C-alpha cells in the first residue's frame, strides 16, 4: 500500500492523468487558502507545494521556496516535510549547510506507527539522500536514483510505505519525477519509466492492472532501441515466450 502525499485542494483526482492541472491548482493557492485547510490536509498540500517547487514540476524550480513549504509542513505534526528540510540543510540545497538545523528538523519527524528503529531510519534515509544528492548535481545519476526508489517502494508493506513517505518519498512522486526527467531523452530513464509503469507507480491502473504491462512496453522498446541491454533482454524474453 502506498501512502500518497498529494491530497487535492478541492477533490481527489487521478494524478497520472491530471498532474499538470493539479500542479497549477496547487501553485495558485494563496496562504489564506492553505491556512483555511484542516491541519493534516494543510500539511499534505504544503508538502506537495514543496515537491513541485523543488523539482520545477508545473512551476519554476525554486529550491528556496520549496524549503519554506517543507518547513511549514513539518511544523504541522511531523508527518510531512521534516526530512526534506534535513536534506536541504545537510547538503546545502537552497540554503547554507547547517548540521544543527538538519538534526533539529529530523527530530521533528513523527515516529508514530513506524516499525523501524532510529538506527535504521538514519541508515536508509542517508543511503537514499546520498543518491538524491548525486542525481541533483549530475543528470547521468538520475536513472540510478529512480532505480533505488523503485527498489525501496515497490511491493512494500504499509509500515514501510509510511516510513518512506515520512522521509519524503512515495510511488506517485517517484513516477512524476521520473516522468519529468524522462523528457531529457536518457535511455536509462526510459527503462526506469517502463519499470515504474509496469509496477503502476502512477496508480493509473489500480482498477485495470492488466493494462500496466502493455503500457510499459512502449518505454521498454524505446530503451531497447537506444541500446539499453536490460530492456533488450526483457523484450527478448517476452517475445520468445509469446
Residue ranges of model-derived segments:
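Hydrophobic face of amphipathic alpha-helices that form TPR/SEL1-like repeat modules
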Residues: 46-55, 84-91, 130, 162-167, ...
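Helix-start (N-cap) detector for alpha-helical repeat units in TPR-like alpha-solenoids
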Residues: 43-44, 79-81, 187-189, 229-231
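Bacterial N-terminal signal peptides
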Residues: 1-8
Amino acid at each position: 500500500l502506498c501512502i500518497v502525499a498529494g491530497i487535492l485542494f478541492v477533490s481527489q483526482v487521478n494524478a497520472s492523468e491530471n498532474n499538470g492541472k493539479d500542479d497549477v491548482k496547487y501553485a495558485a493557492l494563496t496562504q489564506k487558502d492553505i491556512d483555511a485547510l484542516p491541519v493534516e490536509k494543510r500539511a499534505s498540500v504544503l508538502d506537495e507545494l514543496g515537491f513541485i517547487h523543488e523539482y520545477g514540476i508545473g512551476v519554476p524550480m525554486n529550491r528556496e521556496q520549496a524549503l519554506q513549504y517543507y518547513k511549514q509542513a513539518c511544523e504541522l505534526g511531523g508527518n510531512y516535510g521534516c526530512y526534506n528540510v534535513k536534506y536541504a540543510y545537510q547538503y546545502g540545497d537552497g540554503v547554507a549547510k547547517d548540521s544543527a538545523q538538519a538534526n533539529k528538523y529530523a527530530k521533528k519527524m513523527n515516529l508514530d506507527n513506524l516499525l523501524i528503529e532510529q538506527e535504521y531510519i538514519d541508515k536508509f534515509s542517508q543511503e537514499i539522500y546520498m543518491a538524491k544528492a548525486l542525481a541533483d548535481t549530475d543528470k547521468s545519476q538520475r536513472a540510478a536514483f529512480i532505480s533505488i526508489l523503485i527498489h525501496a517502494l515497490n511491493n512494500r508493506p504499509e509500515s514501510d510505505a509510511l516510513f518512506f513517505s515520512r522521509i519524503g518519498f512515495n510511488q506517485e512522486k517517484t513516477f512524476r519525477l521520473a516522468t519529468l526527467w524522462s523528457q531529457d531523452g536518457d535511455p536509462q530513464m526510459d527503462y526506469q519509466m517502463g519499470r515504474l509503469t509496469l509496477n503502476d507507480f502512477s496508480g493509473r491502473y489500480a482498477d485495470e492492472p492488466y493494462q500496466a504491462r502493455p503500457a510499459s512496453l512502449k518505454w521498454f522498446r524505446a530503451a531497447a532501441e537506444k541500446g539499453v541491454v536490460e530492456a533488450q533482454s526483457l523484450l527478448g524474453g517476452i517475445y520468445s515466450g509469446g
